[in-house]
């Protein structure tokens, strides 16, 4: 269990400099690249100031964004993705403020299963919806059966071989429409890749 937010950070700009002599600029956005002159224009997101950096070699590594399927209701403020620490804090704040009683986790990979277990440990009634016939895709079905037993022992329900068709938002929560059935819930966590 993680008790301090700082325990989630593996590296800091200072530790990158100390260990690897790499100058990491957080809260900075590359807004232009001049390949002819080998420069990058950078905007400091805190001050708005722009400056130019020269480079010998340039590696583009913009990161990834969570997948948000194109389904009705996906933009509800009760629908969350988990990709980084700010996402984690947003989910935590929602739970503390709104006191949801139930959650649907869409996606049964490592992150989805871990999130489902944490939500269940926090007292929520949790269902995992997974398109495949088993959790944790790299596992074969027989190995995944042990994971299924463990998850069910935690009180987590499984909707395997099922997918989300639409989300309907209301003052009382969300209705998750599946290929087969519906689930009423207070929040949805997307963990589909």
Annotated model-derived regions:
Residues 1, 75-79, 122, 145:
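Glycine-rich, phosphate-binding/catalytic loops in enzymes
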Residues 1-10:
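Glycine-rich phosphate-binding loop and adjoining beta1-alpha1-beta2 segment
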Residues 9-103, 175-192:
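FAD-binding core/adjacent interface of flavoenzyme oxidoreductases
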Residues 12-13, 115, 147:
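Residues within well-ordered alpha-helices
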Residues 15-16, 118, 150:
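Alpha-helical scaffold elements within enzyme catalytic domains, especially in hydrolases
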Residues 25-46, 53, 121-193:
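A Rossmann-like FAD-binding core segment of flavoenzymes
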Residues 81-84, 112, 140, 144:
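Short, conserved glycine- and acidic-residue-centered signature motifs
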Residues 90-139:
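Rossmann-like NAD(P)H-binding beta-loop-alpha module
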